[in-house]
């Protein structure tokens, strides 16, 4: 669940949540980030509206909070925590970044899904997508690009008042999205290039072999005039 203030963090801890979701609007809220990290719980951090530098700064605050070495919190200490080996290792086990376009609904041209790849490679952290586009195409594409987490708003009726509902999925759509994602995950399969088990039985029928294109006399040489290539692969 998502806390928007310090007391909400405490409430979620008391409720026994295993992970905290920090929204895009709080990425510059250092006290909230510190409070979340001080619980020791893993966090999912949305990065909508953020620059690359702001994401790095937020990770510094989280690293400082997780390390909890008693130093006075300040920008210098945050940067030092993020630059330290201990800080980076702690973040790897605690933080997932979500690329996000904070727009309701988000336009496809503004999604910039490749930025999710940038977050993953630049910060060496798992990355996913908090999606506000209409439909389910973008979350499915994100999974194909290696997203670790998909966040999608859910509603019982898109016509309800408020900015979130029109960018949310109704029950049947959510079911379709999950099923499509599971299919894509299965289809991603292995990076090893080899025939799939289901292909083996088709090799003989689909590939071709050399066959005589006309009667060949004993002792006659094979040439392009008396042989051809045809299915199945049961000839020479």
Predicted feature locations:
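Catalytic cores and adjacent flexible loops of soluble metabolic enzymes
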Residues: 1-236
């Amino acid at each position: 669940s998502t806390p928007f203030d310090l007391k909400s963090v405490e409430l979620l801890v008391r409720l026994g949540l295993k992970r905290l979701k920090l929204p895009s609007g709080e990425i510059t809220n250092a006290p909230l980030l510190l409070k979340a990290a001080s619980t020791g719980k893993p966090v999912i951090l949305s990065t909508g509206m953020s620059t690359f530098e702001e994401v790095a700064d937020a990770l510094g605050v989280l690293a400082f909070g997780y390390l909890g070495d008693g130093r006075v919190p300040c920008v210098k200490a945050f940067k030092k925590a993020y630059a330290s080996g201990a800080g980076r290792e702690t973040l790897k086990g605690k933080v997932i970044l979500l690329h996000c376009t904070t727009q309701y609904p988000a336009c496809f041209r503004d999604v910039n899904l490749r930025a999710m790849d940038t977050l993953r490679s630049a910060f060496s952290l798992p990355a996913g997508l908090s999606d506000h586009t209409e439909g389910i195409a973008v979350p499915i594409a994100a999974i194909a690009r290696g997203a670790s987490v998909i966040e999608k708003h859910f509603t019982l009726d898109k016509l309800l008042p408020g900015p979130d509902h029109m960018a949310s999925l109704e029950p049947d759509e959510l079911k379709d999205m999950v099923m499509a994602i599971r299919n894509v995950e299965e289809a991603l399969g292995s990076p090893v290039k080899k025939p799939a088990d289901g292909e083996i039985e088709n090799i003989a029928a689909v590939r071709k072999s050399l066959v005589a294109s006309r009667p060949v006399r004993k002792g006659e040489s094979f040439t392009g005039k008396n042989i051809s290539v045809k299915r199945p692969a049961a000839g020479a």
